[in-house]
Amino acid sequence: MMNFEVSTTKQIGVGLTTFGFFFIFLGVLMFLDSALLAIGNLLFIVGITFIIGVQRTLVFFFEFRKLKGSILFFGGILVVLFGYPLFGMIAECWGFIVLFGGFLPGIVNLLRSIPGISTITYLPGIRQVLDRLAPESKYPV
């Protein structure tokens, strides 16, 4: 029998990751405020580490096939810290897409299955974008 309880460490990780996204979003809203973006990046990375562990985080970010995405992501963080938030965020976003692009179809399908959010995902402009990211399955499973 499998244990599906979420440990305290993973709960803290989810909270830190959520706060990281919130601070990054707030930093973008505040016209690319470097301090908020830096705090958000730090919280995001620490949260991911708490969720999957130190060893798996290092393996994930420094896997050979994901090295380009990692260099862009961490390089973008450094560029933000050095005071060029626009260029840093562009590099970070590109690196984020390269690193986490494999998870996008699963995330899109999850959003399509949530009752309140699914109606938003089927709006005309949003549906075309999401269909390119993750085409709908033709077969009911």
Swiss-Prot record:
The chain crosses the membrane at residues 12-32, 34-54, 71-91, 94-114. It comes from Caenorhabditis elegans. It is found in: Golgi apparatus membrane; Golgi apparatus, cis-Golgi network. The gene is eas-1. Residues 1-11, 55-70, 115-141 are cytoplasmic. Belongs to the GOT1 family. Changing D131A: In yad83; significantly enlarged AMsh glial cells. GO terms for biological process: endoplasmic reticulum to Golgi vesicle-mediated transport; Golgi vesicle transport; protein transport; retrograde transport, endosome to Golgi. GO terms for cellular component: cis-Golgi network; cytosol; endoplasmic reticulum; Golgi membrane; membrane. InterPro entries: Got1, Vesicle_transpt_Got1/SFT2. May be involved in fusion of ER-derived transport vesicles with the Golgi complex. Involved in regulating AMsh glial cell size, acting by modulating the E3 ubiquitin ligase rnf-145/RNF145, probably by mediating the translocation of rnf-145 from the cis-Golgi to the trans-Golgi during development. Keywords: Golgi apparatus, Membrane, Protein transport, Transmembrane, Transmembrane helix, Transport. This is Probable Golgi transport protein 1. Residues 33, 92-93 are lumenal. Its main location: Golgi. It holds the Pfam family Got1.
